[in-house]
Amino acid sequence: MEPCEGTVGGATKKPKPSPAPPIAALGDDFLGEILLRLPDMASLASAALACKQWHRVASDPAVFRRFDALRRPPLVGFLLTDRGDMPSPYRSPNLFFVHATRNPNLAAAAADGDFFFEDLPAVDSDDEEEGYDWDEWRLRGCDGGRLLLSRGRDGLDLAVYDPISRTAVFLRPDGVFRACTHVVRYAIVVDEADGSFLVIGFDFRGAVFSSRSGKWVKINMERVKLEKGDVTYEHEIFDKIHSFSSDGMAAGRFAYWRSNTKKDRHFNPVERIMVLDTTTMEWSVITAPFPAGESYCVADMPEHGGLCLFSSKEQCLQLWVRNSVGGWVLKKDFSLLNEWMKKIRRAEWMKRVRVLAARAGYVYMEFWSIRKANSYFLVLNMRTMKMSVFPNNPEDPHRGPAFPFFMRLEPLLGPDEDQNVHLDV
């Protein structure tokens, strides 16, 4: 009888498999790629507690930003304002907060949040004028879980407020801007990796405050980069900069201000956007590729070269990207009208889509009607094209600036620190 296969000459001992390399043998780059595949922030926080190397890699700003960009942003809700931001009258806008999360941790944070900044101290004001609330805090911007607030006739008393932890940083740009009634236009940009922030402002001059240095740095607004061929605009740079009468918004590493040019049947107006790249500190003014009056936002999309635009045309969403020579190209154009939106459009006269923000593959919009105060907030996943809907039912319309509010993520703690990491969102 033939011997069974594998038994010739007696039994043989199987070789032992090579031992797995120790954790310490993994290079930082390879370990970073592994950490990027973890499912959520809670898992990343747990990994950061494993050892010093894992904490160093997990808390590296480059890894942290990539991890955050690959996952759904921790949306808590939408902070709405009425027209209180208009040049006249100078008053604090009325606020309204719409809860917009189904995550229990985020919902709990929203329930305890001071989104109307009622815990900030009220001070006596020397500016007494009937009908004006100079001593009230006024919302000027929002990014990374922080609110930028101002008060006083000149709007130069500033606060950066975290409504979840109810902590604030107070600052005043003494000697930077003129003391003139609400002339300065502001914006705030928060670094998600470490929680540091920049406050940007400009009137006849520009300045940036960094929380890392604790100082204001003046910027020469005459060095604003203009689009090639816009000769007329170059001669009118002084006047045109001051046509940006509203506060700015944040979009990743960019801060931007919209001219909000209105449609006019008597001439062909254009919409211009002033942009500050906070990595290079370069200012520029660009012309929007769509007609004036359309709703839009700026987006920071590295996969499309950085600065991009999302605009709405009726109930369609358009993505604009830059080509090799700096011109605008329509990358995507698709209808938002699913069966639900068609039904709402007929039943509630909802026809307008306001684009609020775009972040990490998600676009945040408001579906509203000029006839009614209520609306619906839409969160579109650009990868799956699935859309979440959150109803908004206020008594009065809030058509001023609106801000998606995202949970501010705490820095990752190391294995030798005795505090827990609160990133379970």
Predicted regions and their residues:
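N-terminal entry/capping and adjacent linker segments that precede and initiate structured domains
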Residues: 1-425
